[in-house]
């Protein structure tokens, strides 16, 4: 994770130079989060040989329920549902804490 953050930070610095604009802290933070998550998803999907969603739902029902309860207000406010694939990412972050 540290290496990815450093690489993304460097890339954002280079991008700022290319476009001739200094990004605000808010923009930089949003880009860090978005790009790091994007890279992780691309790496994980490249290595995935099967869809683990159903297995995950069966094996981690309690965790799925916890996520649904914890993020209910966010989901309701934005009118979205956190997909199982994203819950797997959240689970992996929590598990590797």
Report the location of each language-model feature.
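A cross-family "folded-core" feature that marks the main globular domain of proteins
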Residues: 1-97
